[in-house]
Amino acid sequence: MMNLLSSDGVQVLPRPFTLNERRREVRSFVLRQGHFTPAQKRAFDHYWPRFGVDFIGQLRDLDVLFGRSAPKVLEVGFGNGAALRFAAQHEPRYDYIGIEVYAPGVGRLLNGLAEDGSRHVRLYHYDAVEVLNKEIADGALDEIRIYFPDPWHKKRHHKRRLIQPLFATLLVRKLRVGGCLHMATDWADYAEQMWDVLDATPGLVNRAGLRGQVPCPDWRVQTRFERRGQNLGHRVWNLLYDRV
């Protein structure tokens, strides 16, 4: 079964699915599309051909996709796109791939990218596991970023968390040697699970040492919700792993 996750871990229907694909999906969760504004709907019509990548289930040459050879950065579950948009504005030497299944977030980022005149960002509105398995070659990525995945705070729901051993192994395959994996969470027990999983995954080494964390890197913008939480004493864990 596909593991369809938005940036906050909510399973939702991705845009490219056909009716037959929806019928054969076995789901044990409530689907949520959220509030889709007219502007976000127009963004799909006007800007998807420019920034969007339709899932075809075949490996892609990423240099051909972007029309140049540059380091490739993937953000899984970009939410409303704030971090991805910020990175594209401030690190134009990179090519960015974003994956998100929550349609309003994709629409919002499409509008933002068009406003910025971005040329080095491509978006999937699809399942990240499927994209990684079928469209991105092993060793093709220089960085993978996953920010604030849903913590599924109830213990009985921990199995739904994105960061699991099989997924971590998949990420390692897609990173080139010398690349890095950056994750952020504001849930202590999810940080513990991330350490448990990633420290046990061959090919990954914590840059800050065993069960270590790093300050928020310059490439990740802090959201107003994050800043508000920190003002209330909430912690954020930034985990940075090197691919070896």
From Swiss-Prot:
GO molecular function, one term: tRNA (guanine(46)-N7)-methyltransferase activity
A Gene Ontology cellular-component term: tRNA methyltransferase complex
Active site: 150
Catalytic reaction equation(s): guanosine(46) in tRNA + S-adenosyl-L-methionine = N(7)-methylguanosine(46) in tRNA + S-adenosyl-L-homocysteine
Pathway stated in the Swiss-Prot or TrEMBL entry: tRNA modification; N(7)-methylguanine-tRNA biosynthesis
Residues where substrate binds: 154, 186, 223-226
Keyword tRNA processing appears in the UniProt entry: yes
This enzyme's EC code(s): 2.1.1.33
Keywords: Methyltransferase, S-adenosyl-L-methionine, Transferase, tRNA processing
Functional description taken from the UniProt entry: Catalyzes the formation of N(7)-methylguanine at position 46 (m7G46) in tRNA.
Protein name, per record: tRNA (guanine-N(7)-)-methyltransferase
Top-level taxonomy: Bacteria, Pseudomonadati, Pseudomonadota, Gammaproteobacteria, Lysobacterales
Gene name as annotated: trmB
